[in-house]
Amino acid sequence: SRRFGIDWMVTTDHGGPNHSKVHLNHAYPELLESREVVPEVIQFLGMEFDTPAADHTSLIFPQTDAEIQDLVQIEATFNRRESWPVDPLRNTPSQMLSALSAMKELSAPPLLIAHHPSRSATAYRKYGMTTPREMRSWNDLAPKIAIGMEGAPGHQAIAQSRARFEPSKLTQFLGESRPRGIYGSALGGYPTMGGFDQMTAVVGGFWDSMLGEGRRWWITANSDSHTHWSDGGADFWPGEYSKTYV
């Protein structure tokens, strides 16, 4: 991040069974160490939330003494993949609204931003896991928490991905297809529009409608950096390709 001129960033690990303990015992101590080593980059605690009844969302917590306790509380209680065996009651629209209500009660509430909102769409305006109705309901309940969505999703380096030490896992998963953002035909869905999600890209589309309703609804661009393209992944380093300006 420092190399590519980023002033701030947020770490957003995926959730999973009992992952709140991973955050508490492993990820957070490493974040504290990173803050000491690279103090010139503001580093927020967050996670890629397995959203009840929707696709992923980014949670970004303010830097406070209670930041890790707040994240663990929300993840352990509401992340749909936290429990094992899988609990279907954690994957409902009402569970997501309960999560937002709990976030509102925190002394320093997080921000929530919808990730790759149309990646599971099957066609233009044929939405998948995340829908306009859901995002409106989130913003209705918690307008200072649910504030936006990814306009330009990560995984934009997929076209230049190359295997460094072994056959790329992307090739195993996608074949020779290299859809930007891992949207599109390889997954049976609808591609990005020049690297932008359809909810953002279309004039008069979803983003414009949210703004036209008077909602304060922002878009972001992030790296979704799992594995760098030079190591066979689909990703740039944070700030290497796109940046979010605040």
Segments and roles (model prediction):
Residues S1-V246:
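Extended, charged catalytic domains and RNA/DNA-binding interfaces, predominantly
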